[in-house]
Swiss-Prot record:
It comes from Leuconostoc mesenteroides. The keyword RNA-binding does not apply. This is Bacteriocin leucocin-B. Keywords: Antibiotic, Antimicrobial, Bacteriocin, Secreted. It is found in: Secreted. Its main location: secreted. GO terms for cellular component: extracellular region.
């Protein structure tokens, strides 16, 4: 059920963080 959300989340995260830092604070916050 959350597959679509995760695919969108990963896309949004990579878009938000950009190529600057792959391990952005957003990901750390989410975990």
């Amino acid at each position: 059920k959350g597959k679509g959300f995760w695919s969108w989340a990963s896309k949004a995260t990579s878009w938000l963080t950009g190529p600057q830092q792959p391990g952005s604070p957003l990901l750390k916050k989410h975990r």
